Amino acid sequence: MLSDSNIMRIIDAAMSKTADFADVFIEERKSSNVGLLNGKVIKAGSSFDLGIGIRLMAGTNVVYVYSNDLNPDGLIKLALDAADALKGNSLCSVKELESKCFTTATDIKIDPMSIKKKENVDFLRKASEYALNYDPGITQAVASYVTGKRTVRIVNSDGLNKEETSQRIRISVEAVATKGNEKQTGRFAPGTMRGYEFINEYPVIDKTRECCETALRMIDAGYAPSG
């Protein structure tokens, strides 16, 4: 993330012509995922996205520019170009920046991004192996884990200075029962905005058992009566 001083330089540049308001929006996203089929890893990946948006307003006129390059000098030039493009006739001063306020959407005890993928694989494999050994009718087990972390920073010419971080996790386990040419599934896919403590506390074996029972019950169920 950019420092307060560099963000203020960007806002000063944005307000240097006719803008009566300017704000800077910075967003950083991280994600990690892993998927298993019958206990074998079939996909694993991570991603990182970072970008900044600069908005200038003069009355009802708005100019918005954005970039994924957080070089301060380049962003100052971008803000100056936006200021040149904005139509208006006012000249406002920039208020002193507030102390940065950090918030988190939920109480995170263990950052999921700090967990190695091997631990995620071991967690999912435990569910997959249980499902495959539960009953001969269960012929396939699919499991996945996805986590994402989003940090947003908003600073404006009125002195606002806020930053918020949110974290999300979703796991999914699916058991497939087969009988002849017919297949039926049982599945659970809980999501949370907690940290990795959610995974440590989750009764994955109990839930996997429920998935298997659902799939087996469905495969033996008759058709609903018509009429």
Predicted feature residues:
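Active-site bordering "gate/hinge" segments
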Residues: 1-227
